[in-house]
Amino acid sequence: RNTVEIAAYANKLAGIPDMELLQRHGKPVQEQQFEDIQAAVKAILDCIKLGEDEFETAAVIFRTEKEADLGAALLKKMLEGTGFDTKDRFNYLHRNSSRFKKGITVTTFYLAKGLEFDQVFVVFPEKDQSALAKQGRYIAATRALHELYMYSVLTVSGKHFDS
């Protein structure tokens, strides 16, 4: 279901060598580092492709609910000035959510498990290389069908991430 580039990247994250992949090619996985979540969200706005003749779904996937809360608030605020329909096409998927919409979804890796999106933007702290964070990156990466952006972030609102 994923492109070769996304599946190979996810297998590398999980330490799975030489798995035979379906030959559906796409855009290479994009890796980038940002100072904070706000800078990452600005970059996401530049790359998101939703609309006619583009993708139907995109996800911004974070490590924790606290990080997803901040990312969702920033993204929604930035989208409001663009004419994007945040009422019907923006979804913050959290543990109390009762519905899912096409468009942009912001969530955590553990709530994204089992879902698929055309574009996925993964935003995790650079410092966190724990086993759980590695598993989270793998889960998030495998949600992408066509394009995957792996973003690492150094700080949240001027405070360094906790590991």
Listing of model-derived features with the role each one plays in the protein:
Residues 1-7, 15-17, 23, 38, ...:
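Core RecA-like ATPase module of SF1/SF2 helicases and allied nucleic-acid translocases
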Residues 22-46:
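Glycine-rich phosphate-binding "P-loop"
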